[in-house]
UniProtKB/Swiss-Prot annotation:
<comment type="subunit">
    <text>Part of the RNA polymerase complex.</text>
</comment>
<dbReference type="Pfam" id="PF01194">
    <property type="entry name" value="RNA_pol_N"/>
</dbReference>
<dbReference type="InterPro" id="IPR020789">
    <property type="entry name" value="RNA_pol_suN_Zn-BS"/>
</dbReference>
<dbReference type="GO" id="GO:0003677">
    <property type="term" value="F:DNA binding"/>
</dbReference>
<protein>
    <recommendedName>
        <fullName>DNA-directed RNA polymerase subunit Rpo10</fullName>
        <ecNumber>2.7.7.6</ecNumber>
    </recommendedName>
</protein>
<dbReference type="InterPro" id="IPR000268">
    <property type="entry name" value="RPABC5/Rpb10"/>
</dbReference>
<keyword id="KW-0804">Transcription</keyword>
<dbReference type="InterPro" id="IPR023580">
    <property type="entry name" value="RNA_pol_su_RPB10"/>
</dbReference>
<comment type="function">
    <text>DNA-dependent RNA polymerase (RNAP) catalyzes the transcription of DNA into RNA using the four ribonucleoside triphosphates as substrates.</text>
</comment>
<dbReference type="GO" id="GO:0006351">
    <property type="term" value="P:DNA-templated transcription"/>
</dbReference>
<keyword id="KW-0479">Metal-binding</keyword>
<keyword id="KW-0862">Zinc</keyword>
<feature type="binding site">
    <location>
        <position position="44"/>
    </location>
    <ligand>
        <name>Zn(2+)</name>
    </ligand>
</feature>
<dbReference type="GO" id="GO:0000428">
    <property type="term" value="C:DNA-directed RNA polymerase complex"/>
</dbReference>
<keyword id="KW-0808">Transferase</keyword>
<keyword id="KW-0240">DNA-directed RNA polymerase</keyword>
<feature type="binding site">
    <location>
        <position position="10"/>
    </location>
    <ligand>
        <name>Zn(2+)</name>
    </ligand>
</feature>
Amino acid sequence: MMFPVRCFTCGAPIGHLWEEFKKRVEAGEDPGKVLDDLGVKRYCCRRMFLSHIEISYEILNFPKVS
């Protein structure tokens, strides 16, 4: 699914940080360090990044039901 624009718990805007987080983690950086560098301090917001799973492409493989 798409990454949320805001944290589900506190409502802080976090969506603008997703691409930078994803790029740096894929490059091999520690996710916790990346979140610290991006200024994500609340554990509820950090959870949003660490628990997000991209499944959009898997869902697209299912046929439409009429």
